[in-house]
């Protein structure tokens, strides 16, 4: 087992394949607004497909809160190309006199926020009921703050190297789970350093 930081770096340098081909994905949320800057009360446009089943364009908390989801990509260029294609399709098919709100904090919102509707199937009803619970618990305004989520995963070969580096008997999914949990613990501990 590598005891110190320099030994660990040397160990990883001997296995460059374990630090290549990261998986990346983006989930981007944005509000549909009217010309007057108020939240749209219109239903999810049919040109975007079903909010329940479409893999790339769905709704989040509110019917007007769009979410764009990229598949896992191995390169940043591939990731941005896909996200650009989603944006292009959405903008071309926006209903008349609607725009995408560019900021995370919501536009002017009246008291009523139409919850996302996913149809009459059991899973669709469950998703809408879940959002009703969020609305009751936290209020609508907190739920329509939009943002960008960057998803990141290490390649399977990394976890084999990680287990070897730590003399761990864990393999496969067990090694991944232990590694990601350790990463999260250390992020919470040292995350304040990142901005500096």
Regions found by a protein language model. Give the residues of each.
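Extended, regular secondary-structure scaffolds
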Residues: 153-196
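Terminal catalytic/cofactor-binding subdomain
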Residues: 1-135, 142-144, 175, 182-185, ...
């Amino acid at each position: 087992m590598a005891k110190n930081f320099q030994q660990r770096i040397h160990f990883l340098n001997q296995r460059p394949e374990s630090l290549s081909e990261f998986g990346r994905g983006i989930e981007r949320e944005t509000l549909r607004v009217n010309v007057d800057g108020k939240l749209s009360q219109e239903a999810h446009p049919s040109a975007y497909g079903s909010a329940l089943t479409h893999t790339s364009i769905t709704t989040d908390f509110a019917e007007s809160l769009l979410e764009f989801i990229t598949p896992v990509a191995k390169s940043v260029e591939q990731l941005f190309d896909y996200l650009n294609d989603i944006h292009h399709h959405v903008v071309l098919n926006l209903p008349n006199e609607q725009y995408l709100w560019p900021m995370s904090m919501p536009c002017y919102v009246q008291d009523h926020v139409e919850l996302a509707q996913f149809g009459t199937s059991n899973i669709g009803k469950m998703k809408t009921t879940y959002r009703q619970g969020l609305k009751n618990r936290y209020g609508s305004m907190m739920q329509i703050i939009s943002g960008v989520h960057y998803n990141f995963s290490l390649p399977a070969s990394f976890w084999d190297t990680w287990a070897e580096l730590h003399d761990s008997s864990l393999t496969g999914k067990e090694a991944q789970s232990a590694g990601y949990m350790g990463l999260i613990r250390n992020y919470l501990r040292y995350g304040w350093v990142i901005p500096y």
